[in-house]
Amino acid sequence: MKARSARAGRLAVLHLLSWLALGCPSPGRTSTAAGLADGPTRWLMLPEELRQVQRMRTNREAVDWLETFWRRRDPDPDLPGNDTARTFYQRVEAADRLYSEAGIRGSLTARGRVLILLGPPPVLRYGQKRVPAWEPGRPGDRPDIQTRDVVLESWVYAVEDCPRTLRERIAQEEPDLKEMVLVFLVEPRRTELLEGEKYLELAVRASVLDPGS
């Protein structure tokens, strides 16, 4: 079974490398390491894992690191394939189709990140909020302060429907929480996450099933 699991892990790595080809290399790093640090895989990384990737200098380091990365998140190492990796690829593809913004891949946007970590929202809510807006005007003039309406989009997840590992994390942090609400500010060319960052951090930590590997 271990040999089969190792082969499955290598296949997952090879699959992911095809996604990394879409990343942008950074000076001093291989394209593989740059793709890891700058691409959608970073949404799944613990802070210490991101630091490890940023120190990589060879493709061999990146490939070895990836095998360990996915092995730590494999829900059943004795079976071929890795459901966590498979779900990740599917969600990246969906995010790229649905949420691209001003030339940015959908999987690298705020909504793409949430889709990758939590899945599609069972409930969507929309609202508006009036916020200050100002025009600087000419030098020496007072800025013209007005207000404008912005669109708020909320993604709602019932805690009872979350994966077991995430439910356990939430129970430790917020035992009375019934639903997670993530709120986005939606503008024509960009979307920003306003509320819910803590739930994404919990989801990242809950995805690590074998911390010691």
Predicted features and spans:
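Residues within mature, well-folded domains
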Residues: 25-213
